[in-house]
């Protein structure tokens, strides 16, 4: 597994070579919540992968051959097959790779998790379970988590004070080894946002060495 904290590739950069056999490549950006979803699933399932970070203010010309609109995340395997859209990419990883399954095997429970995307805060309180999928972390928890991790960065962590079930869920998620492995320091995140809102292309490499 390669380090996610690599410098971005931008306009004028050479395209990466073929994906090595036995690996899957993730085109990502360290601060993107949608790419964060995919990184969580890769980490949770222990999938061997490499990360190519893309400068979203200064996208490489070649990247539009990976995604027609230049968006992230994108997965690419050694057969040059491309998978994009974060929920689809996460589902692909769960289906294509062995080991821990993050989506339930039961068809109804699988469908129910997908329906929760629009009803999450109501369902969690109603179910009386720690996690959205039950008593153990599952795919739906990882799909939600990136936005909740960012609440403190945006200065709105108190927006969940009136929802005890959500507060318990956030506390439980912060104990998960996968979540802990991908946490970004708040000050680094704030530094990124400061440069990002100045339209500074160096924002995407904030906090990395030269």
What role is predicted for each listed range?
Residues 108, 112-184:
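GST-like fold's C-terminal all-alpha helical module
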Residues 64, 154, 159, 194-195:
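A generic membrane alpha-helix/interface feature
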């Amino acid at each position: 597994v390669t380090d996610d904290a690599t410098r971005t590739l931008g306009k004028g950069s050479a395209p990466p070579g073929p994906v090595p056999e036995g690996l899957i490549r993730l085109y990502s950006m360290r601060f993107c919540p949608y790419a964060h979803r995919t990184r969580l699933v890769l980490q949770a399932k222990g999938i061997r992968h490499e990360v190519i970070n893309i400068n979203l203010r200064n996208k490489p010309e070649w990247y539009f051959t990976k995604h027609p609109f230049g968006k992230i995340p994108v997965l690419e395997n050694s057969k040059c097959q491309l998978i994009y859209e974060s929920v689809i990419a996460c589902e692909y990883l769960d289906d294509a790779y062995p080991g821990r399954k993050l989506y339930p095997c039961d068809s109804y429970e699988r469908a129910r998790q997908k329906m929760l995307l629009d009803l999450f805060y109501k369902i969690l309180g109603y179910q009386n379970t720690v996690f959205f999928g039950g008593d153990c972390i599952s795919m739906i928890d990882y799909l939600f988590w990136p936005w909740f991790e960012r609440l403190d960065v945006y200065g709105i962590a108190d927006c969940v004070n009136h929802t005890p079930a959500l507060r318990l869920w956030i506390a439980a998620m912060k104990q998960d080894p996968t979540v802990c492995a991908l946490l970004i320091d708040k000050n680094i995140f704030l530094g990124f946002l400061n440069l990002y809102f100045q339209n500074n292309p160096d924002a995407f490499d904030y906090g990395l060495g030269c």
